[in-house]
């Protein structure tokens, strides 16, 4: 019965030390569309919100599947949209990046670079990039991991 959800930054500290502004996700996309200006109809943000709502549905009530975001503590500030893991054991096991369109080379390099950096930092061996309609599998050099690029509609149809 929440209208807006707040997504905290991943931290292994008992006391949250992040000064980052948490991400906010509105459950009712129709309301967001109605009250936002025409130039703020960002498809990427709307896709990210839809993915968040599906993750909330899949993980509700489970301690071992906490959803957070993650920003690398480096000068590049590489970000992953969703990090899923065990809250008490501080063990991340899933990384999800959301991108509406990976057709632009700069966007593709940014999304893959961020996901690869966080995968190495968190010791997660696979990552997921959800798009509007693109799909492929990307093997990292030296068998360090795999990216799966999936259309978000197909991912939403998979069982949790």
Predicted feature descriptions by range:
Residues 132-160:
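Domain-level recognition of nuclease-like catalytic cores that cleave nucleotide substrates
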Residues 92-96, 126:
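Structural motif
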Residues 60-62, 88, 116-124:
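Arginine/glycine-rich "motif VI" loop of SF2 helicases in the C-terminal RecA-like domain
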Residues 89, 101-104, 134-136:
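Short Gly/Pro-enriched loop/turn and capping motifs at secondary-structure junctions
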Residues 78-80, 110-116:
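A short, acidic, amphipathic alpha-helical segment used as a generic capping/interface helix at domain edges
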Residues 97-103, 108-111:
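Terminal-proximal interaction/regulatory segments of ATP-powered molecular machines
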Residues 125-131:
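Short, hydrophobic beta-strand segments that form beta-sheet elements in well-ordered domains
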Residues 1-92:
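Accessory nucleic acid-recognition modules appended to NTPase machines
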């Amino acid at each position: 019965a929440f209208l807006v959800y707040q997504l905290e930054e991943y931290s292994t500290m008992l006391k949250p030390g992040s000064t980052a502004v948490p991400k906010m996700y509105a459950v009712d996309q129709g309301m967001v569309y109605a009250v936002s200006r025409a130039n703020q109809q960002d498809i990427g943000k709307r896709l990210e919100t839809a993915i968040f709502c599906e993750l909330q549905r899949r993980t509700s009530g489970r301690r071992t599947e906490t959803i957070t975001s993650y920003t690398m503590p480096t000068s590049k500030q590489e970000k992953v949209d969703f990090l899923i893991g065990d809250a008490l054991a501080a063990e991340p096991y899933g990384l999800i990046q959301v991108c509406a369109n990976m057709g632009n080379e700069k966007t593709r390099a940014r999304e893959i670079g961020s996901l690869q950096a966080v995968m190495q930092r968190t010791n997660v061996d696979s990552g997921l990039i959800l798009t509007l309609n693109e799909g492929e599998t990307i093997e990292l050099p030296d068998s360090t991991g795999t990216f799966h690029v999936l259309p978000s509609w197909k991912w939403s149809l998979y069982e949790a």
